[in-house]
């Protein structure tokens, strides 16, 4: 099963228990490290198209009992990164930050062979300035960030989630941990804030009652998402959760903590303190939306998707799904 192969690029898992989730994050922290090296000293090697090199490394990994790690890499990126004389397999989620560090982009990169792609990376890194901050997790390189704290600030996942839990214990007693999802790119957890439902949603419930709608339909919640590989900041999303089906209704923009400008846990703690006020603000906006009449929901949804420049095919699929949800 994929869930047992933490090293695999497509590894993912879910948790319904907060203690198990935290223990899992502790294991991931123990199996990861951050290292700094001059960007121009980094050298990539392609395994694809080089049978002799592939066989040599497979023998090495077999002797270390980690042949599956290399086999998974060959099925995905087929890249090794040499850092200070040691070769590390490269995970798929690292490609985004690698390209950003090398300052290259373009669809053509997906069409060239791995050998050509590797040469391009090495040429670009050879003229790069400054240091790179590299995360190695579960035997593979997961990210290559800029080495200056202004470029990338490390905010470890474990203390972030622990801080959110402590904050909810203190400020939102009576909450429930619903679920958490982990993969090598991004981690998300969701809590249901039952204990504060009346306080946060009193006006909202009153407006629902005035319109003849059930006040038990939704409860407040929090979704927290973070990433160590450049996919997301440490972002707090106030949400509503439908009571019957558990669907999530986003409430405006998240409270974002970007991994830049020397951001630290103290800064994130300050962001947590904004959560109650953000709930109030977004609920007020939600109430105002109740006065907006939508006569043609299908066309309205298509218009919204066009506004955000969603692909046409995906837009029609989303609009059809939306139509089925509202039972028109």
Explain the meaning of each model-derived region:
Residues 2-163, 171:
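Feature for intrinsically disordered/low-complexity regulatory segments and propeptides
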